[in-house]
Amino acid sequence: MEDYAENSFNVIPISMEYIRDLRTATSFRVYVIYIDLVLILALFLSIHAIRELTSKQLFSKSITHLLIASLVYGNVHNASYTIIETWSLYRSFAYSDNMTAIMFTSEECFVQHVLNSCVRFLFIAIELALNVDRIIVILFRKHFHCYPGVRGEILNILAVILSFALGCLLHLKGPHPGIVTTSCFRETDITINLCSTNLTSYTILSACCAALDFLMMWYTWNDRKKINYDLNSQYLKVEQHHSLMAVSLNSLLQLFVTSIYAISMFVLANMSMTNPELGNANLLRWFYTTPYSTLLVPIQIKVFIQWIGNRRKRRINTATRVSLTQDGYFTKLSDSWK
């Protein structure tokens, strides 16, 4: 977890001219309008994906429940982020000549800091819940159909508790007097301060989730090759393989897009030591990739639903052709004895 040392939040002297340029820059205003449009698009795609998940039973009830929760929490995060940035945009117009009012203080942003931190952790925690559900399915394959809906709800609740507990734990010291920021998204963003971004905890959670995804994919890929003469067990194994691979790929791609933000922050923090302009708030915004991740998730779900559905159709068509061939063979054999 982050080391909130006393010198982590030193007040950085910034000229009024620099603040005016930062807060009224066209790049900042264009970004807010652009990201709001991205988040609206993500909302519409998520609604469509949720309808697909509820109408087509291609995943178990627990996985379906957690995938829907992932879509919902992604859009909750987007709503929180949109409110924060749009509020900042409003101030950049309303107080363009008041350099004190145009900035945000740590005290007025504290609730938003905590909420946004919790929701970002929840975005990763729900992926961990999906991993736990897949582990349960693998370990108890013959009984995975027992209480799948309840299992999904329990894992969902645990993910919420974990993320909000971690988010609140990282803000136990409360607001930091004297600190100002361009929006309520980060506790300090005039220059990069990695001690105030929760990146360490965020990166650890993402890395653990990605490692579990790779493990699940490796196991299910090798497990499908094992011969099983129980037709029902073999069918369940194939169905679980398709759904688990789809969910793992979805989670990995989502985490990859999200991790770009963490990597960029570390890189820009080092580069800004020699060139401070590489650490200013307007540049940092463009590297926040979680909104793109929430845009990607419903698209991925739609693709995987189509993929699994097509594979099922091919399997059914193959089985039907074999059945007709066998019927024709025995009909001809019967006729030959007449």
From Swiss-Prot:
Membrane topology recorded in Swiss-Prot or TrEMBL: Multi-pass membrane protein
Main location as per UniProt: membrane
One term under GO cellular component: membrane
Entry's localization field: Membrane
One function term, GO molecular function aspect: G protein-coupled receptor activity
Domain of life, source organism: Eukaryota
Annotated InterPro entries: 7TM_GPCR_serpentine_rcpt_Sra, Nematode_rcpt-like_serp_alpha
Keywords: Membrane, Transmembrane, Transmembrane helix
Pfam annotation, one family: 7TM_GPCR_Sra
Keyword Transmembrane belongs to the record: yes
UniProt keyword Transmembrane helix, yes or no: yes
Segments passing through the bilayer: 30-50, 63-83, 120-140, 152-172, 199-219, 249-269, 289-309
Coiled coil: none
Biological process per Gene Ontology, one example term: detection of chemical stimulus involved in sensory perception
PANTHER family, A to Z: SERPENTINE RECEPTOR CLASS ALPHA-10, SERPENTINE RECEPTOR CLASS ALPHA-32
Homology family: Belongs to the nematode receptor-like protein sra family.
Name assigned to this protein: Serpentine receptor class alpha-32
Source organism (scientific name): Caenorhabditis elegans
